[in-house]
């Protein structure tokens, strides 16, 4: 065998295993059952003729090329043999390798030599090469013949073509290719949404050849959200040295939060934030609205023999979401994907329960617990507010209204202690003080006022020894507001004025004593020669002026009750 022969079978004419055959070399071989298909070179006559000008089809004189055996060995051209051997794969060559080369040549000098698989045509009918390209056309290489050979072939009406066969793309070539540009993200082939997965190689399941398991991180509408979920899970599992889709500096806040959580808890938190799958008209997982009565119904899938479990209908979607969460915890444990935070539920009671605590049980208990917790918070707020709350009491002065504040504390004095100034003002007969001189009456009133203020000041000093932080005005103001029954003391006096009325008429006076914000107010209403009902007048006044003149300015009077509005006057307002 020649050392230059690369075909794998002998080209010697003495080989008896290759008997000569005659072929009708037209457009298609007569013995071919199947035509040429795509990704092959077809030799087609554009004019539809396969013979010479005389209409005769050229015959194969010597199939093995007895006339020119040297050219067969020097040119290394492929001679076609039995069609059953060479065309069983619908290609021009036996598929020895993926890149087989087929050379077909035509020589006008040897018209009867068909050992080179020559197709005889007329000078003006040139054969054309038709190329059917598929998806792998970029892998095909066509080598043209040299210019000298092309010139000789064109002159004789032949053509030379070198063809490199294409390799079909196998299914295994596409296996494992990513459907997303991000790591750990795949695109669902049906829904078109994106899912994030993480491969946890820290464990090995029984019966698996590959170490580890796939951790589902949820489905997402956006590809970048799924990529971020993968990054967070990868940082939790493998630390900052892992490869992420986005810079680690984008996750500084999440990295601090994940330090206080386990892997399972953090993955569950990531999955709770997923929003990729349709949930009907509700924003909660496992909750849909009933199409007839509009109530919310809850379902959970893949629990009862890999089927959906109907959980019931609820008036609100929050209750339906809670029912789904309880069922998810019951069937899937701590790794369950819930609508609300898992610490809202009594996980231990749910897992230990022999039945599913749904149907007004767990949801109502949850609401009761929330109501109790909110009431406790309100009580704590009230206690904290009461410790710093200042009770405001208004004091009426001549210049305006000011507000004094006092902490809500019980008044330390007993009831009997502040009664002394009131008793000293009641049922006092002051007729022996009545003179014709107005100055004497004013002196008496001034003396009575000073005695009362000294009495009050003594009690104030006793209290200030116990509570040095509060002044007397604030304490008595708060005490009098909390004990309104002690505010009014009625002083009835009967004065007969013989000087002014000349003995012809009598005057009746009703005087009301009132302990106001800062001292004592005295109001009076009078009628002359009448027995009608007298109104009670409450009079407030300011403290004595600081200039030492002893004047009483800023007195005001207010009618409290009575059918006679007349006779109200301002005292000591000269």
Swiss-Prot record:
* Modification note: Stabilized in root meristems by reactive oxygen species (ROS) mediated oxidative post-translational modification triggered by RGF1 hormone peptide in a RITF1-dependent manner.
- The ranges the UniProt entry gives for DNA binding are 181-247, 283-341
Q: Which PROSITE patterns match?
A: AP2_ERF
**Where is the protein localized?**
Nucleus
Tissues where this protein is expressed: Expressed in roots, seedlings, flowers, and siliques. Also detected at low levels in leaves. In roots, specifically detected in the distal root meristem, including the QC. This tissue specificity is regulated by auxin gradient and depends on PIN proteins.
Q: Which UniProt keywords apply?
A: Activator, Auxin signaling pathway, Developmental protein, DNA-binding, Ethylene signaling pathway, Nucleus, Repeat, Stress response, Transcription, Transcription regulation
The cross-references to Pfam families, in alphabetical order and at most eight, read: AP2
Give TM regions: none
Protein name from the UniProt record: AP2-like ethylene-responsive transcription factor PLT1
UniProt source species:
Arabidopsis thaliana
């Amino acid at each position: 065998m020649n050392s230059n022969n690369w075909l794998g079978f002998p080209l010697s004419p003495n080989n008896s295993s290759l008997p000569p055959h005659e072929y009708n070399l037209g457009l298609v071989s007569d013995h071919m059952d199947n035509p040429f298909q795509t990704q092959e070179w077809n030799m087609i006559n554009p004019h539809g003729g396969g013979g010479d000008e005389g209409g005769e089809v050229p015959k194969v004189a010597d199939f093995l090329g007895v006339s020119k055996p040297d050219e067969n060995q020097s040119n290394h051209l492929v001679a076609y043999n039995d069609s059953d051997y060479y065309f069983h794969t619908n290609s021009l060559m036996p598929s020895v390798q993926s890149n087989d080369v087929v050379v077909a040549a035509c020589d006008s000098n040897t018209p009867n030599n068909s050992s080179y698989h020559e197709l005889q045509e007329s000078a003006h009918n040139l054969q054309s090469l038709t190329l059917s390209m598929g998806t792998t056309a970029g892998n095909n290489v066509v080598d043209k013949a040299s210019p000298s050979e092309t010139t000789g072939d064109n002159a004789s009406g032949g053509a030379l073509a070198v063809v490199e066969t294409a390799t079909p793309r196998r299914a295994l070539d596409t296996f494992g290719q990513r459907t997303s540009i991000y790591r750990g993200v795949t695109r669902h082939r049906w829904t078109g949404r994106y899912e994030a997965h993480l491969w946890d190689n820290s464990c090995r399941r029984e019966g698996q050849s590959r170490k580890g398991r796939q951790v589902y991180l949820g489905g997402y509408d956006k590809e970048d959200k799924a990529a971020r979920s993968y990054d967070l899970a990868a940082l939790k599992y493998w630390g900052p040295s892992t490869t992420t889709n986005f810079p680690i500096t984008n996750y500084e806040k999440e990295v601090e939060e994940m330090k206080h959580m386990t892997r399972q808890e953090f993955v569950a938190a990531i999955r709770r934030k997923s929003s990729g799958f349709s949930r009907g008209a509700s924003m909660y997982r496992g909750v849909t609205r009933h199409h007839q009565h509009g109530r919310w119904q809850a379902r959970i899938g893949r629990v009862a023999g890999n089927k959906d479990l109907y959980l019931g209908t609820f008036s609100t979607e929050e209750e339906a979401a809670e029912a789904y969460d309880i069922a998810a915890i019951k069937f899937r444990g701590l790794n369950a994907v819930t609508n609300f935070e898992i610490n809202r539920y009594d996980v231990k009671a749910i897992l230990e329960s022999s039945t599913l605590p749904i149907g007004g049980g767990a949801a109502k208990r949850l609401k009761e617990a929330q109501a109790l917790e909110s009431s406790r918070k309100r009580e704590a707020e009230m206690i904290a507010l009461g410790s710093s709350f200042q009770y405001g009491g208004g004091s009426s002065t001549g210049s305006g209204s000011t507000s004094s504040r006092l902490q809500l504390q019980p008044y330390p004095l007993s009831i009997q202690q502040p009664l002394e100034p009131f008793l000293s003002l009641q049922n006092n007969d002051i007729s022996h003080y009545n003179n014709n001189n107005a100055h004497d009456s004013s002196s008496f009133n001034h003396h009575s006022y000073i005695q009362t203020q000294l009495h009050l000041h003594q009690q104030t000093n006793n209290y200030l020894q116990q509570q040095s932080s509060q002044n007397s005005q604030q304490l008595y103001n708060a005490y009098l507001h909390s004990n309104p029954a002690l505010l009014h003391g009625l002083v009835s006096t009967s004065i007969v004025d013989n000087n002014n009325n000349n003995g012809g008429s009598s005057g009746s006076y009703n005087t009301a004593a009132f302990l106001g914000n800062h001292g004592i107010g005295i109001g009076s209403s009078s009628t002359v020669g009448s027995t009608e009902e007298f109104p009670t007048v409450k009079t407030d006044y300011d403290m004595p002026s600081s200039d030492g003149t002893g004047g009483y300015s800023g007195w005001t009077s207010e009618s409290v009750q009575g059918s006679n509005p007349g006779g109200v006057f301002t005292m000591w307002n000269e």
